């Protein structure tokens, strides 16, 4: 499963209010109120366990969790992979 699809699946299964929603990769999730700082912490834990990464504290920013695209880039960076 592609990383973006896996992130979408995690979001829909983890975040209340996203259940059953069809999310676009560039859909703004913080700006629209779907996720907040509490959910970001929740997602960090899930991502670290699911993708076997450690998210650096300095990488915790709203922009890194705003969209599925941004989350995918963050995870790939933490894995040491290119996000091209």
Q: Whereabouts are the PLM-identified features?
A:
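Phosphopantetheine-dependent thiolation modules in NRPS/PKS and related acyl-activating systems
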Residues: 2-44, 49-84
């Amino acid at each position: 499963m592609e990383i973006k699809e896996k992130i979408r699946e995690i979001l829909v299964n983890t975040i209340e209010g996203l259940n059953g929603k069809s999310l676009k990769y560039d859909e703004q999730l913080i700006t629209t109120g779907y996720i907040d700082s509490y959910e970001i912490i929740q997602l960090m834990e899930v991502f670290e366990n699911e993708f076997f990464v450690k998210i650096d504290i300095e990488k915790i920013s709203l922009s890194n969790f705003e969209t599925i695209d941004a989350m995918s880039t963050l995870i790939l960076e933490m894995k040491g992979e290119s996000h091209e």
